[in-house]
Amino acid sequence: MAIRPIRWPGLAFVSMAAAMVMVPTVSSALEAQITRTRYGIPHVLASDWAGLGFGTAYAFAEDNVCLLADHLVTLSGQRSKYFGADATVTVAFQDIRNLDSDAYYRGTFDDAALRQAVRSTSREYRELIRGYVAGYNEYLRRIGSAHLPVACRNAAWVRPMRDIDALRLNEDKMRLASGERLASAIVGAAPPTEPVASAVPVADGVDAWEAITGRLQVEFGSNGWAFGAETTGGAGVLLGNPHFPWTTTNRFWQVHQTIPGKLDVMGVTLSGLPSVVIGFNRNVAWTHTVSTDRHFTYFELALDPKDPTVYHVDGRPVRMETHTVSIEVKGGPPVRRTIYRSMFGPIFSVPALGLGWTREHAYALKDADELNFRAPDAWLRVERADSVAGILRAITEPVGIPWVNTIAADRHGDVLYADVTPTPNVTDQTPASCLPAKVNAPLAKMRLYVLDGTTAACDWSPSPKPGQDGLLPASRLPRVLRRDFVANSNDSFWLANDLAPLRGVPDIVGRVDEPQGLRTRNGLKTIHAAIAGRQGAAGAAIGPSAVKEMIFRNHNLAAELALDDVLSICRQSTDALTSDGKPVSLADACAVLSRWDRRMDLDSRGAALWVELWAPLARSGAGYPAAAVAFDPKDAVSTPRGLSLESDNPAHVRTALADAVTLLASRGVALDARWGDVQKAVRGERRIPIHGGPGSNGVLNMQEAAWTPGVGYVPVHGSSYVQVVTFDEAGPVVDAVLTYSQSTDPASAHFYDQTELYS
């Protein structure tokens, strides 16, 4: 594995092999200079914001035109027209039917409201997206439909971008962690025609939530570390390691953007966004990790007994709004769908959670990130910050950055952790009467909040700042500036630095004194070991090389914590039954696990067996199985640990191991298969070995992979963009890699080159 150093080229690009192109429009009203350096990274130079957006979109289209064109079809609600109603598309990291996707986007994206909302943004941002639309369209005009990549060549669904598309692209990204998770439940909500039961056992409710919305903390992941002067001996060092999809429209893309005298920033953006969202400038570097905040709440509506589309607020009947859309369908007649909306937001129905639409009640979703156009300007401020204090100001003034923590380090040796995101103003002081006990009790474990919709007094508490009504004020949201280190791997703010735990934050933001995920624990253990190992030593500072070694160590924490007890169970007996009662000898499996290096390196043997063993064990205990040493909030980094050897737990472990042995045999995978031979990225005819492993195993270099017959474990999300940044007198010193490469076009050399580098 390698990640490459990035030179900070400024405006000269003199030391870099490059291909440069000037890209004027037909009218020459917009212009940008695009310089491609190694691995196809574009450096976009423009004299103004519109030109920067123009060049950025043009360069993105060169790499990913079919990806973006396809996504525009999704956002305009036309997938059924071109691809059929029953085909699927990924929405908020879930695959749903095209018909449901079309109904969701057509029925819940209000173009008039989007146009109104964008008026509150800065002129810089409005010019940026004006140029972005023009740049994408200029690329289509120049290349022509017949010369597009094979995936969209001469396709009827490829069309020029419109201004409204740029606004939809922003809205789509804002809702990823909230409204879009319930897209199918929103479009499936319909008034009942007969009484419907809504009670549900707690355990079934948990399972239903995960089945409907996906496991947010698994699919949305990241590691963010920042080391300050007390650990580096000088300038800060930042690790940015977001775990995002390797496919579909939420891929990252690298770019360097420059407007002389106004902006000089490099990093990654997401497909369809015009600005760098994770990156660095000459003075500061930042990254994001998905936060634990709930960016939405539900409202329980009391319905009129005579009409389930009428609800009562403060004794007054209110009729639901309806939005009926007619969806064109390939090879069939149009289909009509109706979306229902209350004063709080759209109606949804999840009967398995006790949130079905019955004669008595319906449930509405209120989303803090709906129409969030504060985010684009927040990122523009972050890009121009000159310190972590400047970044903190950039994110706290608008409270616009959606659903992510911010971790940053600067050249002065200061570091920042902040969870400042749009979060409903629902606190521990919210009256109990506003949280109906019957419906909330089964949802408390998941921190899902159902408010009483019968009175406006239970709506989100007013906020003093204009444009942030109903949101928690920034002063109530957690943040810390330090000089030693901060870290986050998607657990709450509590242990951003475990030497000084944070408390006193509303529950809707996150909880304290709860078991931490294995990546959080592995990260903190690794950081403390690195600090301890350098104390009193020559060259004791933690620098970029040390940080790279830490993140790519591929250490499996689950194995460190539990494998010795598995081997102890093996020594008791190697006879086992699978979960369906078939006898299996575990002798070979136990021998393989005893020799395994407990890492997820390419040459590790036994890793596949452990992955398949640990998966059911972790599920049985909501992240960690029955432990020998239980969780202790005073020792959260080290507990829980071990496996319980009491009662029937050893038999349960043997069964899980027998199932793993049987599963690997059915797939033709040897128990001691080399990990790099079974986990591979597919790039055309190339099969590229990939290291790293599941986050549920505590592997920092996370790769969640799907079994693909004939190939093996194929990464679907995990380490995506990795940057390690520090600063010297000349500017930022950066090592970075985009694991899945810049382009989605198989004909491009940049479809696979960084994937091979990462390997």
Predicted regions and their residues:
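Hydrophobic alpha-helical segments
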Residues: 361, 401-530, 613, 617-618
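Substrate-recognition/specificity elements adjacent to catalytic centers across diverse enzyme folds
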Residues: 30-249, 260-262, 266-275, 280, ...
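Glycine- and hydrophobic-rich flexible loops that cap the catalytic core of alpha/beta enzyme folds
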Residues: 259, 267-270, 279-283, 288-448
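Bacterial N-terminal signal peptides that target proteins for export
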Residues: 2-15
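Gly/Pro-rich active-site capping loops and adjacent beta-alpha segments
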Residues: 46, 51-97, 287-338, 461-516, ...
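Terminal end segments
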Residues: 497-582, 677-759
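Boundary at the C-terminal end of the N-terminal hydrophobic targeting segment
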Residues: 19, 27-32
